[in-house]
Amino acid sequence: MKTEWFKLGIYTAAYVMSFVLGEAGLSAPSGLCLIFAAAFLYLSEYRRTASLMNLRGLLALGLLGGEGIARFQLSRLSTDWTLETWLSFYLFYLIFDLSAQLADHTGAIRSARSGDDADRSASCSVVPDPLASTASIDVRDVGGVPGRSATGESAGVDLRFFRYAILGLLGISWAAFLFEARRLGFVPLFTVDTPHAYSYFHVKGVHYFTTLAVLTPAVSMLYLAARRTHGLRPDVLALLGLLLPIILTILMVSRFQFMISVILAVFVALLSGRRYKLWQLLLLLALMIAAYVFITIERAHSVEYLNGIFEMKDPSTPIFITQPYMYIANNYDNFNVMTRELTVHAHGLRMLYPFVTLSGIKFLIPSLAQGFPLFVTKEELTTVTMLYDAWYDFGLIGIAVFALVLGLVSGRVTRTCRKDQNPFSVLLYAQLAFYYLVSFFTTWFSNPATWFYLGISFLLYLAYACTVRKRRKE
């Protein structure tokens, strides 16, 4: 416990120093303080859990690291942060971390009282170091789950379930894509001089199913891990499950869909106990960058167009620096604009938007789906951080409650995943890990697509559990 308080003390000191330096007009040192805090918190969590995929560490790395990058203020669009902005960003991680500790501590007490030692055996929180020099999978105690031993009886049902899941996801996503392409009359990749082709490639209610492709590579990694556990080599279906969804994201020229597909697959592999050599990770990173650049070129955004929007203080800054910088930093500046200009809060309507949309209530009560003005530095730059809607709804109280709930959920999910024998718990955990790592990018938990992916993953979780239970009864 003393270590935890020391860690948060360092975090607070770094934040105070960043605030003081920022108020003095020293942008770069202010940013470095927050980047130090992000790295320190992540490494502290890694030492505590021996896991590169620890949720508290990933959120620190993504959210606080993004704040540090934003504090460099390399664009003329950047402005001095308001006191509300500073307090929101500081309090969010503080409350999140404390509530996650509380959930983990109470869970440990409950396990000790019940004599439940199962949570010491599993793989979500404590996994082998993926940067180790050899690739291997841990063998534990339950069949069919990556990282656990398998019995011959369970092997067949496990592998069949994965095959059905992969075929189902591939069939649904490609059928939906072809339907959209036929209905809309174009495929974004093959358009000419259409910078926002993907933005128009949406058939209401159908596009959710097209983007289910992002889950397929991750499920394929679970399938590959299960095959290795059973002593089997990769098969054609596993390769198709990895490649066809990537091809689909390229056809849609969607950088986001491409990134989430690849990163989720890697996260699932790491959480399943897969170890990679450093050169393998570097090769994967190089391929991702190449594909990302290709998709960016196909989106038909010229360098002149992007530089004109970004308004960098140094016009000679190369585009490969300005584009990723602005896609991170400007999101925090958009939050700052909101704290200055918002006069009436939405009282929960923005955070509840996924429920209103996915339940169909918006068709019964259209007023609930009404649009709210977006407070941004520039109309072309509309991405925001994960905290944007919490403030939009209730201000600083919304930030505090959001942090509390997310921390409690994270602590509970981490403990549950440690002892859960269902491989699809890894898929759910990997999605949370991804959202935390890129928490600077959008309002994940008030985005209907986020809940759609989590919902489908949970259905796979339940279906797998029912299949195993039925098999045991036979």
Which positions does each model-derived feature cover?
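Hydrophobic alpha-helical transmembrane segments
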Residues: 3-8, 26-41, 158-160, 229-235, 238-240, 259, 281-282, 400-401, ...
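Hydrophobic, aromatic-rich transmembrane alpha-helices
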Residues: 36-46, 215-229, 401-416, 471
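Small-residue-enriched transmembrane helix-hairpin modules in multi-pass membrane proteins
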Residues: 193-203, 291-407
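Hydrophobic, lipid-facing residues on alpha-helical transmembrane segments of integral membrane proteins
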Residues: 5, 9-17, 170, 216, ...
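Membrane-embedded catalytic interface detector for glycan/lipid assembly enzymes
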Residues: 21-31, 102-276, 288-305
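Hydrophobic alpha-helical segments
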Residues: 379-474
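N-terminal "leader" segments that precede or initiate the main folded domain
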Residues: 1-136, 238, 242, 261-293, ...
